[in-house]
């Protein structure tokens, strides 16, 4: 309690905006009349609140388009431009994004940058780690856990833009496929926008390709293998495919820091 009281005393009240006087509205003089519009201070405050509501992990605090390093790789530069243009044009284009590529190339960085750009435009967004979401849903089946599956999924079902990070990271099972289908189909039917990242490149499942024996075991798993062919097809109705391919982004910075 004492700590909280000290924090309250130490807080410095924000200065009143000299433009709007704290109302959040400012006058705009047109040629023939006078109008009011939202003040910049209100928009900044709104963006800050929406960013907090998006529940981004603190490890991504510094992730935006200006901090993404392409390292001179044309494919990464092209991916960055495509994603940033999409974020700038939203909501003119409400089709989502599917960012696929090898681990460590900065897919989540770019997806988070897009999410932040949308909050600056007043869009309600939510970050979801695919593995954490499935784990929380599984835990909700425990009688000692108060949150129900529906309560956990409601924000995922209702938020205008959801970033589903690392799709396919959990070993596939009927339950996993059913849960992924529920999430994606619900958002699809509600015409909500979804940004997805995955380390698994696009491709049909092994069962669809009818691969057997050594050929099947040597083949790299695809997105179709991890989420099921039906949901892979649904993704392409919901999202623009963006291939993010290049040198390991995280390894590059670890190497730079060791020099």
Please give the residue ranges for each predicted region:
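A short, basic N-terminal segment
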Residues: 1-78, 254-259
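Short glycine-rich substrate-engagement loop in P-loop NTPases that contacts/grips substrate
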Residues: 74-80, 119-158, 174
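Walker A/P-loop nucleotide-binding motif
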Residues: 93-111
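P-loop NTPase Walker A phosphate-binding motif
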Residues: 109-123
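Pre-Walker A (pre-P-loop) alpha-helix and adjacent loop at the N terminus of AAA/AAA+ ATPase modules
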Residues: 69-97
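Loop/turn-to-beta-strand initiation segments
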Residues: 123-124, 158-161, 190-196
């Amino acid at each position: 309690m004492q700590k909280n009281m000290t924090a309250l005393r130490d807080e410095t009240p924000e200065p009143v905006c000299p433009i709007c006087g704290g109302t959040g509205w400012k006058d705009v003089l047109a040629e023939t009349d006078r109008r009011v519009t939202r003040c910049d201070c209100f928009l900044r405050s709104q963006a800050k609140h929406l960013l907090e509501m998006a529940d981004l992990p603190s490890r991504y605090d510094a992730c935006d388009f200006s901090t993404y390093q392409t390292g001179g790789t044309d494919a990464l530069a092209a991916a960055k431009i495509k994603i940033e243009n999409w974020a700038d044009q939203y909501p003119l284009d409400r089709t989502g994004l599917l960012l696929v590529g090898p681990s460590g190339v900065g897919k989540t960085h770019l997806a988070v940058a897009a999410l932040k750009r949308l909050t600056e435009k007043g869009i309600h967004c939510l970050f979801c780690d695919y593995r954490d979401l499935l784990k929380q849903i599984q835990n909700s089946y425990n009688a000692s856990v108060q949150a129900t599956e529906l309560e956990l999924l409601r924000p995922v079902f209702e938020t205008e833009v959801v970033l589903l990070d690392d799709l396919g990271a959990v070993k596939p099972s009927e339950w996993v496929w059913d849960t992924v289908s529920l999430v994606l189909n619900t958002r699809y039917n509600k015409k909500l926008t979804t940004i997805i990242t995955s380390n698994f490149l696009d491709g049909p499942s092994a069962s669809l390709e009818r691969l057997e024996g050594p050929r099947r075991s040597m083949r790299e798993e695809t997105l179709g293998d991890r989420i099921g062919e039906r949901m892979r097809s649904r993704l392409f109705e919901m999202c623009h495919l963006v291939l993010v391919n290049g040198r390991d982004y995280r390894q590059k910075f670890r190497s730079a820091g060791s020099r």
